[in-house]
Amino acid sequence: MKETTAESTIQLKPNHSYGIDLLKFLALLLIFNSHIDIAYGSYRALATGGAIGDVLFFFCSGFTLFLRPTNSISEFPNWYKKRISRIFPSVFAVAIIRCLFFDTHDDIITIIISWNDWFIPCIMMYYVIIYIIGVYARQYIKHIIIGISVIGAVYFAIESQNIPYNMYGNTYLKWILFFNFMLMGAKMGICFPKKTESLTKLLIQAFAALVLYYVFYFIGQRSTSDLRYIQFISYIPLFILVQRLFMIGEHPKAQAVFMRKRVFPFIAFIGGLCLEVYLVQYYLITDRLNHLFPLNILLIFAAVVITAYFARCLARIIRQTFQTEPYNWREVVKMY
């Protein structure tokens, strides 16, 4: 990755993937968009992209985790402790906000398991598995991805008998398949940096993969015949799409656009709030502003981002409270 010296762009940090920053930003936008169906009113079909956002987030997690080697299983407790200290202060912070402003009171067990939501338990389980793979099977990641895909195909063949079936909906199939995206991110992290390809070619491939993903998904998901099995094929272009988006984000020509001083701070700030936005968005999405459509979407997004930022600040205070060092207030309010 070439270092950019132009005054209009930010100063590059060595060994930092700015493509990951872009993917986190895209993941947040897609996850948020998929949850605001009631705010779209008559245009609810536009509330899509949640699965793409989820797998982008898992890809980013796998990538950053494998940038640092995992050498010994004895190091796992301290390694896992760092994951806990990153995620659960935000979970507790959002629980406090829910209690103070949304009159929602949960017991500690409900809070720890994240209010019966799938995402936090899923990623905490992923951390355990991926660490073991990092220690004992790092060189077999491709084989593991293939094996998980086969398991997912068998699971899909059994579960899809229940029509209609959404493989990216409320099903354990996505727990199986989405782990492959974390593994793909880990594989890319091991191989980082990669050789640059044509940006035009990458954009065309990403667009084609996006179209194929939706074609296979919608045909299969809405079919009551054997065509429903086509839905599983959507997993393949989704895999390609994530990889190509990462390669686009790492391309110097793309970085010349999104790494401008007036653009990148916004991308980094929003992308850095991905976890907190996921946790707080449910309590701020409303249809009371639908008469302002499409302005209501922007207003809700702004409210979610502001609340997520305060949740992250509170999470950092909680985290620092249990450390021996003095409070670092600059770190608490840091934007990105």
Where does each model-flagged region fall?
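Alpha-helical transmembrane segments and their membrane-interface exit regions
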Residues: 61, 118, 179-186, 236-244, ...
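Membrane-cytosol interface segments of multi-pass membrane proteins
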Residues: 1-155, 160-161, 195-207, 254-269, ...
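Extracytoplasmic catalytic-loop and juxtamembrane helix elements of membrane-embedded
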Residues: 107-112, 170, 226-227
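Extracellular, surface-exposed passenger/stalk and repeat segments of large secreted bacterial proteins
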Residues: 32, 168, 188, 226-229
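Short glycine/serine- and small hydrophobic-enriched flexible loop segments
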Residues: 64-67, 134, 186, 190, ...
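Alpha-helical transmembrane segments and terminal signal-anchor/GPI-anchor hydrophobic tails
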Residues: 172-179, 193-303
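Long hydrophobic alpha-helical segments that form multi-pass transmembrane helix bundles
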Residues: 150-191, 195
